Amino acid sequence: MTLTLQKVTIKINENRTFYLLERNVIRMKRRIQTLTLALCFCTAFLFSSCSFMQKQEEPQVQNHSELTSTESFPIKLNVGEEEYLIASKPRSLAVLSADLVQALGDIGAASLISGACTDAPSSVSLSASQSCGTALNPNLQQLISVRPDWVLVSVPMLQSSIEQLEQAGIQVICFDYPDSIDSIKERYRTLFSLCYGLEGTQKAEAFLNEYQQRLDTAIQPASEYVRVTSKKKAIYLAQPDYTMATGETLEGELLDQMGFDNLGELGSRWSYPEVESEELVPDIIFYDSQLDPEQIIQSPVYSQSPAVLSQQLIPVDFSAMRLRGLPMIDQLAQMAQSGYPQAYGG
């Protein structure tokens, strides 16, 4: 009897030991699971915190004006029938046509000009630039020593000159000489893009809005005044007796826009037909300020014209007009006010 009880006791103890061991294993598994979850949570929290701090530290572009040079360039520039890739913002330009020097001065980019034409307008500050000749007679050695990013011209260079510059790694951009107000504006847009890349679009629009306002102020009062009065007959005389602005020229078109009857419309390409000389009876003569007015007064063609008899000979700075820039508008304002002073309160 006693032996049987002992065996039972031993069996019971073995079962209890197994039960306790199994319960401890379960508790350990639960603790491991809890620790694993806690570790995953901490890892996720640290990762998200680092990402947030990194985003806070990264600079952000707020608007278009904050674009870097890399972001504003490269751009493709279409000039005439040619396309140019402007890889980065130009640091240096050589400009061999006076009208392009004026245009860059107008848009505030004259500081980029490291080489300028010999006939550059004195009104544009070029203190840091070297004289490099002209488009038709360039100083190639000087150009190569200046090392511009681009050479700009408004008349075609000789192919031999272009090839020598290309061998030195310098490209030439040939602009069309503008023959209308629209083409003047388009050239300004192109120059803004060349100098400022994508930012140039906004800069160009702001500039051209001011340009148009300035032009309207110069000539609109005269054009409105002639609606209630008769037009004056006028010519824009480059050389006596028949070299004058004809109908297809910009100067001829501007005479019309200012409310004048341009007698030069009978001619073409700055040449008036001599056989029509009897029709040359202008009320006002705008002439190149480099001319001696006595040449006009003594001319058999104009000596008895209303313009000479009433002393309506108005000098005009033709060089400023040919620059096709802001100085041209100043000359137009003087012409319009001379012809129709009443329209301007005179």
PLM-predicted stretches and their roles:
Residues 91-146, 150-155, 263:
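A short, structured surface patch at a secondary-structure boundary
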Residues 182-196, 220-223, 286-346:
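Structured C-terminal subdomain patch of bacterial secreted/periplasmic proteins
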Residues 119-122, 242-271:
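Alpha-helical, coiled-coil/dimerization segments enriched in small aliphatic residues
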Residues 79-80, 130-141, 267-275:
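Short helix-initiation/N-cap motifs at beta->coil->alpha
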Residues 2, 7-15, 19-21, 25-31, ...:
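Bacterial Sec-exported substrate-binding components of ABC uptake systems
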Residues 97, 155, 177, 238-240, ...:
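Short secondary-structure boundary segments
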Residues 160, 175-192, 233-252:
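Extracytoplasmic ligand-binding site segments that recognize negatively charged/polar headgroups
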Residues 38-47:
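Bacterial N-terminal signal peptides
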